Amino acid sequence: MVCSHRLLEDRHAGGRRRQVAALASIVVAVLTLPAGAGTLAVKDNLYGVKAMSASEAWAVGNFGSIYHTADAGKTWETRDSGTKVPLFGIDFADAEHGWIVGKSSTILATADGGKTWKPEKSVIPPEKHLFNLKAIDARTVWVVGDWGAIATTHDGGATWEDRSLADDVVLYAVSFPDPQHGFIAGEFGTLLATADGGRTWEKRPVGTEKTLFGVSFATPEKGWAVGIDGLILRTRDAGQTWEVQHGALAIESLEELGFLETLKNPGLYDVRMAGQQGVVVGDTGNLMTTADGGETWTARELPEKQRLVWLRGVSLLPDGSAGFAVGAGGFMAAIDHGQIVLPANGRRAAAGL
């Protein structure tokens, strides 16, 4: 059983109706993969991915699942996480040092290139979930999550500092284009910015209270945020001002399926910019790319069987030349200079480009 990743109305917060991604519902999805190492076809729901090279990537998902590929997704192996909670985000500072975050304030770390993963003592209460992270270097990491959760380490994970907000706001994404400049995005149009390496954070108005699920800054000045209702925002002045962009959502081919009204404004869940290359992923198979620094976005139509699949995570190499995207039911796509090849996990086919 694959659970929907659609938006759900949840509790009210400060008089504002809250809309959240259905991350909580993932715990009832059925996992059919065996634990332990071994080559396999991935069928699990996947939420986070990290591209290490054009051929190597890591992905995380349901029930503590960690996957690794060294051949651009033709084959994948599992790694033991030591937990069964869903894992939402993964990042590496270098080839050896990486971190994973997940449900119940879970933080896992590796110092041997992912061969082994060990839990770290989280300062975030277990009733909060951690959704995203950024490993700036082997010593400095930022994580964000539920109920305003923010935490950081400056000693490689030996100790963590709780920097959570007082506000009841879910934080979904964090981006650091360099060690000094960082940005955090979340619900109700929340956008936080730092210019001093995270010592202080200030709110930046984005002109909307719509939930932002993804944020990515290519430079300290140029950034993008994505969210509900197909929202794409762009800033050219470090988040001081934002403009709405209109992405090319792939909905026309879905009209015959009878879902057009529902699919007109799908949630967009992640964005990555690197150089002139960029990728946005979201509900109902929406995958958009740019090759001109985000001036224009092109919809990449997926094969028919994947057109209703939600896509949750995307990662690009620093030069934007390659990357990976992941989503529901083991969806994996390899990205090669803006061209999409999928599925990445052994059933490769051109994505209608």
Identify the residue ranges that each predicted region occupies.
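N-terminal secretory signal peptides that target proteins for export/translocation
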Residues: M1-R16
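Intrinsically disordered, low-complexity segments
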Residues: M1-V2, L23, A93
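Extended rod-forming repeat segments used as scaffolds/tethers
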Residues: H12, R16-R17, I26, G352
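Short, surface-exposed loop and linker segments with low hydrophobicity and enrichment for Pro/Ser/Thr
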Residues: A21-A22, T208
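Bacterial N-terminal signal peptides
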Residues: A22-T32
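Residue-level hotspots at or immediately adjacent to binding/recognition sites across diverse folds
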Residues: A35-L353
